[in-house]
Amino acid sequence: MIPRMKLFTFLATMLTAGLVLADTPAPATTQPVDLMTMTQDARCKQVVVTCLINGQPMRMMLDTGATHTVLHTESAAQLKNARWIDTSKMLFRGNSSQRPQLLIAQLLAGPGDSPEHPIMVMNLSAVRSMMAERIDGILGMDILHALPFTFDQRKGQFYWGTPVDAALTPLFAKADGTGRVIVQGQCGERKVHMLLDTGSSVTRVHTDEWAPGEGAEIGAKIGDIDHAKGIKLMEGKAGDIELGAGVAARGITPLLCDKNEPPMLGMDALRGLVLVHVPTEDSPHGLFLIAQ
């Protein structure tokens, strides 16, 4: 039996401060659901899995750049037996202008079972519009920290579990205090700091950290949880980022941003590499490993 997932401190505190959760069994599904198969979105390259939330299948993106698991508003409205929480007096912090709703439900994701999982509810229309196939939500590090998974972009294979044939080395990274990790890569003589963000299709780097310098101005369509829009921005000249001992993202051309914009290591930089996550007892985010 897989142990119940740990909750983030502020949510655990909120739940135990006056809310008692009833043991509500999830409704049985009418057909078997494959919880183990991962697919890659044809347009944006994020990895998607089917999960069961209170027994209902939901297509969820694996997003190491998200602190919390989130359901799209329309998908959340379809749930049965969910416990909705009053959020009117809660303080939320994040990069969205939306005020999230919150529900408690059973979440089955791959090999993991979180019987009473807090799930944010937000409008994900902007995110969904960027993808080839629409998703119901996002699996954040609140659940992913406890699950092993592998993105093997050498072979085009994505799966729950860890590989047996990869020479893995620790990703150069540190915790950011919210369950996520900040990659501390090396580009030439400069350190490059980026959020590890498998929910992003592109890599974005602070201009002053990109050793190869600026390239050309390009037009790009970018999206976040609130907006999807076309903008013009600078692209960096091609360069390499060392991500682990002897492992580098080679020949990448990241988008360049100023200090007010969050830098991120996206799925484009992981092409040809193997990214592995291993849960650990002594870390809120687990251990990320990488191979060439």
What does each of the following model-derived ranges do?
Residues 1-11:
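Bacterial N-terminal signal peptides that target proteins for export
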Residues 22-292:
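Pepsin/retropepsin-fold aspartyl endopeptidases
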